[in-house]
Structures are given as C-alpha cells and as structure tokens.
C-alpha cells in the first residue's frame, strides 16, 4: 500500500528546498510534476520542475478531467495529473505532491488517507526577507504574496502536520520523520508485512 504525501506552504517558506533535500535521501519517494501556465524561472526545466503549458492547453486538459486537482495561484493555473498519480501509486511507489492549500484540500477529498504537511516560515519578517532575496518579484508582487501567506496560514489547522522551517536541514529531517512514521502505520504494515505476520498466526 503506497503513501501519498501533500506538502503546502506560503510562497517563500522554503518548501521546494525542503523537498529537494528530502528527495536526495529518500529514493522510494517520487515527486509529482505539476502542470502550470506560469512562465519558467531561470533555473527551471520543462518536464523536470513543471510541465509548462499555455492557458488554452491547460483549460482543455481541465475540461477532459485530466487533473486530480487544479487551482489558480497568483494569477497562474496549476494542476496535478490524475493518470500519473493513479499509475504511480498502483505501482506501489510513494508519491509526494508540492501544491498550494486549495489543491491540498481537493486531494484530501479524493484521497482522505493522504498525509498533509504544512511548512511555516519562522516569522513574517523572515518570509519577507526570503522573498526579497530571491530577486524575482517587484515590491508590489511581494506584498501580494505576503497577503496571500496570511490567508494560507489561516488554514494551517486543516493539515495533519506542521513543520517550521527555521533551518533547511532540520526542517527536511522533520519531514523525513513524518514520511517514515506514515509508512509504519499499522494499516500499511498489515499489507506490506502480510507474509511475515502470517508466519505467526
């Protein structure tokens, strides 16, 4: 029985860095690559970071029901491939979704057993500094992201776990601990260790 993990955070909280660190040490975890209409950033590659598509293509895919979840974030559309998730989990591979709060709630509706993790920045000031240091956005865009962060953080009680990203390595270890604990839950071990348990019955 495979596990599905959902990680959400405000823009600038460091979730992408946490996930990259986690994936370097956990070969049994596969990151779902989302579709998006936003332009790629300087260091992003199509098919690796996102599948970059135009608005019309995204809307066509959405109309055909190809997305397990989709949402508009900061004026851009994002979606998760339904077929890819179903096939990967059917192959007994654990899946990690890096999505916004809207998408996280949609996923929980379809997969109530999914483990949801919210990554908090250590403070609003720290979040602002991180957004400024990225050098990607104008001041008005940063202010809009900070306002969105307040709204997103107000929904933190809907998540199973909360990790504060004071320091990258520590936050990544915290998330890794959550992943391991979920894998060891009885409902999953009864399936994975079926033959072992049968020896004692």
Curated annotation (Swiss-Prot):
Q: Which Pfam families match?
A: Guanylate_kin (PF00625)
What are its GO cellular component terms? Answer: cytosol
Q: What is its main location?
A: cytoplasm
What Gene Ontology molecular function terms does this protein carry?
ATP binding; guanylate kinase activity
Provide the binding site for ATP.
Answer: 9-16
Q: Which PANTHER family match?
A: GUANYLATE KINASE (PTHR23117:SF13), GUANYLATE KINASE-RELATED (PTHR23117)
Q: Which HAMAP family match?
A: Guanylate_kinase
Regarding protein family, the annotation reads: Belongs to the guanylate kinase family.
Q: What is the protein's name according to its record?
A: Guanylate kinase
The lineage is: Bacteria, Pseudomonadati, Pseudomonadota, Betaproteobacteria, Nitrosomonadales
